[in-house]
Amino acid sequence: MTKGILGRKVGMTQVFGENGELIPVTVVEAAQNVVLQKKTEEVDGYSSIQIGFEDKQAYKADRKSNKFATKPAEGHAKKAGTAPKRFIREFRNVDTEAYEVGQEVTVDTFQTGDIVDVTGVSKGKGFQGAIKRHGQSRGPMSHGSRYHRRPGSMGMASDASKVFKGKALPGRMGGNTVTMQNLEIVKVDAENNVILVKGNVPGPKKGLVKIQTSIKKGNK
């Protein structure tokens, strides 16, 4: 069954394995996870748990920022006996009997050696060309080429007379939801609410990440 938790990316460091191997790891701090809702097939058509992460400030009538909770959000969190949460995510294929509404989900849900998928929002790179954005090869840099870093052909001229969808063009790069699959948990530090994940995970420092059991290898 799937296990999951939400956290923030602290940064990267390195640890030594038992055989002396140097392992690059990403530090994820995962505290304040609370089960806000349990969904069942009878009522909702599918089974899942809804987890909230990081408290929001209480509702204010003259609020000018989304850091303050709305009245519906306050009512939803009140059913779980907790404060409104800033981030809310669902986890399917979960043993719902093992969770209760209002229960705190801690990092010791996972164990060292577990294989997980980590989802986050990639770093924004701003407006970039086709080479950096899509990995396109550049043209010859020699004198007289007249084709160096341009996107290339836009398509046929007379017949189609249009640029087809999917053409690799310059544009805004990054800021996409990215999932890194089959990453290994190197260490779980329950005292500090920290999980060490082998390798890198999407997003900048302090970015929100979602960790769940690998859909390809986690249930084997």
Curated annotation (Swiss-Prot):
Keyword hit for rRNA-binding: yes
Record GO biological process: translation
UniProt entry keywords in alphabetical sequence: Ribonucleoprotein, Ribosomal protein, RNA-binding, rRNA-binding
Matches recorded under PROSITE patterns: RIBOSOMAL_L3
Region named Disordered: 126-158
InterPro entries: Ribosomal_uL3, Ribosomal_uL3_bac/org-type, Ribosomal_uL3_CS, Transl_B-barrel_sf
Domain of life of the native organism: Bacteria
Alphabetized GO MF terms: rRNA binding; structural constituent of ribosome
GO CC annotations, alphabetized: cytosolic large ribosomal subunit
PANTHER family on file: 50S RIBOSOMAL PROTEIN L3 (PTHR11229), LARGE RIBOSOMAL SUBUNIT PROTEIN UL3C (PTHR11229:SF16)
Subunit structure: Part of the 50S ribosomal subunit. Forms a cluster with proteins L14 and L19.
HAMAP family per record: Ribosomal_uL3_B
Main function: One of the primary rRNA binding proteins, it binds directly near the 3'-end of the 23S rRNA, where it nucleates assembly of the 50S subunit.
The family this protein is said to belong to: Belongs to the universal ribosomal protein uL3 family.
Protein name according to UniProt: Large ribosomal subunit protein uL3
Organism, as annotated: Macrococcus caseolyticus (strain JCSC5402) (Macrococcoides caseolyticum)
Gene responsible for this protein: rplC
